[in-house]
């Protein structure tokens, strides 16, 4: 999985010019599922996102997680994170998971997140417009295939 994590003051997703979901302070996630992703990737990503200390404490240090601040998550599916741009000028998306697998894993990912933090979603496969107010900005890229083996 490739996930772009953005710390936001607020964010919303609209579909067909109607607001579908919105959050106040928390995280906006752009979530790309790869063909080799599975339960281990979901667990790792959720654990990292929920506990990642990227919110400021009283001393201004990034020392608090989205869970600590009682924030929310807005999760948006985005297969384009798996774009292959090596050949030509048109990105290829052959490195993205097939829609059936991606949809299932995206749903499972969001269910796991929602067990930890209030989580809202876009609609998988929909044409969405996402608006946000970055906080910082703080933007982190998480790739579940690029992780240390935990002991």
UniProtKB/Swiss-Prot annotation:
Enzyme class at the top of the EC tree: hydrolase
Pfam families named among the record's database cross-references: Tyr_Deacylase
Gene Ontology cellular component list: cytoplasm
Subcellular location field: Cytoplasm
Reaction it catalyzes: glycyl-tRNA(Ala) + H2O = tRNA(Ala) + glycine + H(+); a D-aminoacyl-tRNA + H2O = a tRNA + a D-alpha-amino acid + H(+)
Notes concerning its domains: A Gly-cisPro motif from one monomer fits into the active site of the other monomer to allow specific chiral rejection of L-amino acids.
The protein's name: D-aminoacyl-tRNA deacylase
Organism: Streptococcus gordonii (strain Challis / ATCC 35105 / BCRC 15272 / CH1 / DL1 / V288)
């Amino acid at each position: 999985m490739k996930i772009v994590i953005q710390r936001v003051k607020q964010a919303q997703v609209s579909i067909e010019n109607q607001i579908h979901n919105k959050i106040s302070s928390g995280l906006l996630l752009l979530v790309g599922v790869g063909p080799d992703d599975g339960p281990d990737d979901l667990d790792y990503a959720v654990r990292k996102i929920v506990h990642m200390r990227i919110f400021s404490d009283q001393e201004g240090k990034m020392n608090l997680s989205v869970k600590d601040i009682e924030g929310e998550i807005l999760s948006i599916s985005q297969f384009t994170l798996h774009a292959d741009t090596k050949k030509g000028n048109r990105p290829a998306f052959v490195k993205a998971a097939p829609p059936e697998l991606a949809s299932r894993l995206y749903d499972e990912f969001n269910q796991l997140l929602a067990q930890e933090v209030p989580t809202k979603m876009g609609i998988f496969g929909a044409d969405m417009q996402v608006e946000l107010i970055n906080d910082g900005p703080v933007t982190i890229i998480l790739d579940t295939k690029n992780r240390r083996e935990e002991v």
